[in-house]
Amino acid sequence: MKWDTGRMARIIEAAQGKRVVDLCIRRCRLVNVLSGSIDTVDLAIHEGFVAGWGSYRAAREIDADGMYVCPGFIDGHIHIESTLLAPAQFCAAAVPQGTAAVVADPHEIANVLGLSGIRYFLEASEGLPLDFFFNLPSCVPATPLETSGAALRAPDLDALLPHERLIGLAEMMNFPGVLSGFPDVIDKLLLFQARRIDGHAPQLGDLGLNAYVAAGITSDHECTTLEEAREKLAKGMTVMIREGGQSRDLAALLPAVDEHTWPRCCFVSDDVHPDGLLREGHMNVIVNRAMSLGMAPVRALSLAALTPARHFRLDRRGALAPGYHADFSMSPTLNPWQPERVFKAGVEVARDGRLLLDLGNGNGVAAPPSPMHITRLLAEDLVVPAQPGLLRIIGVREGTLLTRKIVLPPKIHEGAAVADLDRDILKLAVYNRYVPDRPPAVAFVQGLGLKEGAIATTVAHDSHNLIVAGASDADILHVVDAVRKSGGGMAAGRTGAEVDVLALPIAGLMSDQPVERVAERLEQLQGRARAAGSGLRNPFMALSFLALPVIPELKLTDLGLIDVSTFSPVSLFETS
């Protein structure tokens, strides 16, 4: 919603009480994140903006009867693709939770579809009752250690910059490239020096962090320890406190937020699955968890609205004050925050957890075709010939994206290393879905818990090849074939039985179905994985990050097993 001469003149008049305002929320308890106070006021709205509070005549009135009103929430870092929902369906799920805007990183769809994927997001999110801002992906592909569906260089990003909702550069995951001065990395950093550049530097500190910040990188959402957060705050970064579907760092990082640092802290979800979005909520659940851990309510609400708006220079957002966007929710209680009524630009868009608008499939924008070029499914490709030495194994850890490097003697059968269910060791494989006739990369993983069958997904950060873990080679081939035939998605099953599949026709990442339907199908898959023995809260999300070679310690891409600490491939067997 843009300002022009006429609108500004009318709002100036309305703010002075010289014009009847569109809406007045009478007797509301305004959570003022600018002053830290909570005041009972009559809040006046005109043409989608706050006119002020005081004595106003209004065309329409709502008696809040003491309900609390706070600014709409802003998620400062989210991958919409992680919700498995198209933009319109994500909007329908998030807006009733009080979310007014997101700053999204489309590097998932960009890794699959390149610029056409970013353009699809821009077009599909246009005109929705939630503001989608985007940071352009900095790392497509994320690293040279994997194969993606596209490669984006600085000139490619430059071509998109005129779009008003493209506001910065998304997480610079290639921190070794920053520290080593890789030319393509430097070109991207220079292109965005006048804008915000998001970081991604887990466990980086000392002189390396000095160099990373000196390059103009302004935030990080990868802090997992209090010491890490404090060092990054001390060196000028905004710390985005992540509380998402897989990584939950709120409890560990909350002590870093104090009187001096809170303006440079904000809450983000990063990755959240549809079942969590439907069952728990979005930014509102992070706010409520922060309050339950002892954070003052006004501050918790500030970190979900004001501070992300200030960090990203989203003018007139993140607070309710004269001239600010009239995006807000109303709750009968301050703690917990329960958004019973949600307003966007002064219009009620959700009530009692339901969107009041029928978005259908959004604005009708069609997604580009999804690549699925897995043409080779051979049992011999999964065989790991036995070698001298111990086996390097990826260790999954509940509640974090960090994995452990485990070294154990392999189980050998007929001259080959195989899955060892007694020790919770499964075979792991990554199939390249962009180049036909490629054999998979194969490794082993501990911690997924399956006792039979296999689970697979084309949501495999960040290049989104097909990743699968299974108790046997036959199970792996059976489930991979089902995903391939669906055109991309998630699946669970075993040899000799029907495979459950959640089809994701949009880039192999997202569904065009409503959140309720997607969450139901996902829960069926999770139930299938749990019935097969997995004890993880979200085995599919855990699986989806095992191919991401920018988060320590050990990962598997289509090019092989990767030691993240050295940013290089390693053999499956350790001989020394």
From Swiss-Prot:
EC number(s) from the headed UniProt entry: 3.5.4.2
GO molecular function per UniProt: adenine deaminase activity
Cofactor: Mn(2+)
Top EC class for this record: hydrolase
GO biological process assignments: adenine catabolic process
CDD domains: AdeC
Swiss-Prot/TrEMBL keywords: Hydrolase, Manganese
Catalytic activity: adenine + H2O + H(+) = hypoxanthine + NH4(+)
InterPro entries (UniProt xref): Adenine_deam (IPR006679), Adenine_deam_C (IPR026912), Amidohydro-rel (IPR006680), Metal-dep_hydrolase_composite (IPR011059), Metal_Hydrolase (IPR032466)
PANTHER family: ADENINE DEAMINASE, N-ACETYLGLUCOSAMINE-6-PHOSPHATE DEACETYLASE
UniProt record similarity statement: Belongs to the metallo-dependent hydrolases superfamily. Adenine deaminase family.
Protein name: Adenine deaminase
